Design a protein with these regions (language model features):
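Class I (Rossmann-like) S-adenosyl-L-methionine-dependent methyltransferase catalytic domain
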Residues: 33, 39, 46-57, 73-149, ...
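Class I SAM-dependent methyltransferase core
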Residues: 155
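A short acidic, Gly/Pro-enriched loop at the edge of an enzyme's catalytic core
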Residues: 207-217
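A short SAM/SAH-binding and catalytic strip from SAM-dependent methyltransferases
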Residues: 216-229
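A short glycine-rich, Lys/Arg-flanked "PGG" loop and its adjoining helix->strand segment in the class I
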Residues: 232-244
Length: 335
């Protein structure tokens, strides 16, 4: 807006994007992307996310407020569009509910303690959750999932419900979510009506779900923290509850976090064995992992394809240059 409070942030972004555009689209850069199995669009999104993070740290408060307001508006719009594409018609978004207390956010989604103040802000928290919900809907639809009234969705490791709360916009959907933290589930039950919340154990089963009953299962930032010795049991359990033709969407630690979190010796072990873990006592682990005594779990692509491929068809293995990688998998339909 000319003459308004959004002018300076828009100008700042425009100049930074112009600085990056030539390099991002150069022939040599595209060759690098192909070798790394990432797309130009993914790199652009990563660059923009990096610019947003820098802007939120260095710009004056009034500009930060403008940027977060823009991101929230764009994220809500993205979710409405994703719902429209999934259902073939417009549906109203559901009020997301309160922002959880900082101690719950800290236990689920922080790489470092310094992130807490920013990620606890309402606009930032909601923008991220709207965007994640839209991302999952779009990827599940692209993998062949048919969205319909009365479908069933399960989120394992739901944390404070930031993601599944938005899926209440799906007409008459059965929404089920679970987490190992009883305090988190207590907050969810009191704050987010319309969702079945359960406390699950560190190991399966999830006895509250019938076999072949779920259309879409979600595990965001879950298999990034499940010890390798337990992963097969959880994969088998998730495959049990998903109906034939259903979709499993999950994140895993990718090259970005390998480069950021592991030193040379750890990367060498990972390359040789295909697997590596950091427990919460290791200073290299993420802040949330240290806070709750969990694990950060690293796997190479061949190991991921071998282990997850035992139970699912991998429809999409999306590598993220600025965050976790994503797997979109399906249970083969009958016949």
């Amino acid at each position: 807006m000319k003459g308004g409070r959004f002018q300076a942030p828009a100008t700042w972004f425009g100049r930074r994007e112009a600085d990056c555009a030539g390099y991002i689209n150069s022939r040599s850069s595209k060759t690098i992307y192909q070798r790394a199995s990432v797309s130009v669009d993914q790199v652009k999104r990563a660059c923009r996310a990096t610019m947003v993070a820098i802007a939120l740290m260095v710009l004056p408060p009034r500009f930060v407020a403008a940027i977060t307001a823009i991101r929230l508006h764009q994220s809500r719009r993205d979710l409405k569009e994703a719902l429209r594409e999934a259902l073939g018609r417009d549906v109203a978004l559901v009020e997301p509910g309160p922002v959880p207390p900082p101690e719950l956010i800290a236990a689920t989604s922080l790489m470092s303690k310094s992130d807490l103040q920013l990620k606890s802000q309402k606009h930032v928290y909601l923008a991220h959750s709207y965007r994640s919900a839209a991302w999952i809907l779009n990827m599940a639809r692209a993998a062949g999932l048919t969205f319909r009234e009365g479908m069933s969705i399960f989120e394992l490791g739901c944390g404070e419900g930031r993601l599944i709360s938005h899926l209440r916009a799906l007409p008459r959907a059965r929404l089920v979510a679970s987490d190992v933290r009883a305090d988190t589930i207590k907050w969810c039950r009191n704050s987010l009506p319309g969702i079945e919340f359960h406390v699950n154990e560190l190991e399966p089963p999830v006895a509250f779900l019938e076999s072949n009953s779920v259309d879409l299962a979600i595990a965001q930032s879950v298999f990034t923290h499940i010890p390798l010795a337990w992963q097969r049991a959880w994969l088998e359990e998730i495959a049990r509850v998903i109906r034939p033709g259903g979709i499993f969407w999950c994140t895993i630690i990718g090259q970005h976090h390998i480069d950021v979190m592991l030193d040379k010796d750890a990367r060498q072990i990972l390359e040789e064995t295909g697997e590596f873990e950091l427990d919460g006592k290791d200073p290299r682990s993420s802040y949330s992992t240290q806070l709750i005594g969990s694990w950060d779990v690293f796997q190479t692509e061949p190991v991921v394809r071998r282990e997850f491929g035992r139970y699912f068809e991998i429809a999409n293995y999306q590598k993220n240059p600025a965050g976790p990688d994503v797997l979109v998998m399906r249970v083969p339909p009958l016949g």
